[in-house]
């Protein structure tokens, strides 16, 4: 049986999932966190589904093997590729980023027209479109915005070049008259101001990061796994499969100095 003292395991293809980690820290400040960013293999967007699945499950195997009380797949592309496998594979609860955002978008829309933006792999998987299928009276427009991740990973989140790119990507959503837009990649909240500017103030942006943190809180509460206020001091560990120094520089934009002690990830698991 899981212990409330075990950490929350968070995994992403790179630094984007730190938006989820930030939201978890804000909403559950007493929780220990182990975060692994697969910067050595990410971004996942251009990869094939089998490649994404292999990389993602190797890291998830390692996190679960080390001992976590809940596993958060903080990557839309990985959620679309391996969520079912992960839930069948592990005894701990697995939280992903797609369904929480879908629920929030359905609640937020006024005209039933909802947009989704994400990586090519996420949009091509139809994971969001399928998740919205159960919602009545909704019309979904999904658009891939592959270069957004490249700009965020390079630390560029504003400026005329990115705004021009955003206006081009988002034009089909404006034509569709969406009033709610799901940021279907955990990198995209860092571009939220720019996306809002391109879409207009009347469009509601839904962050999968914030909604995922709410789902983590709900699951831990439901299973009586919340860490007590009087538990030992909080310990947050951040690891990267690629260059830790490069990760630190990018991660500072998400979490500030809290990630100064990034460690190289040493994975021992293999996908079966």
Swiss-Prot record:
Name the pathway: Cell wall biogenesis; peptidoglycan biosynthesis
Q: What is this enzyme's class at the first EC digit?
A: isomerase
Which GO terms fall under molecular function for this chain's record? glutamate racemase activity
Detail which positions bind substrate: 12-13, 44-45, 76-77, 186-187
Keyword Transmembrane attached: no
Presence of the UniProt keyword Magnesium in the record: no
Keywords assigned by UniProt, alphabetized? Cell shape, Cell wall biogenesis/degradation, Isomerase, Peptidoglycan synthesis
Pfam families, per this entry?
Asp_Glu_race
Similarity comment text for this entry: Belongs to the aspartate/glutamate racemases family.
User: What is the name of the protein in this document?
Assistant: Glutamate racemase
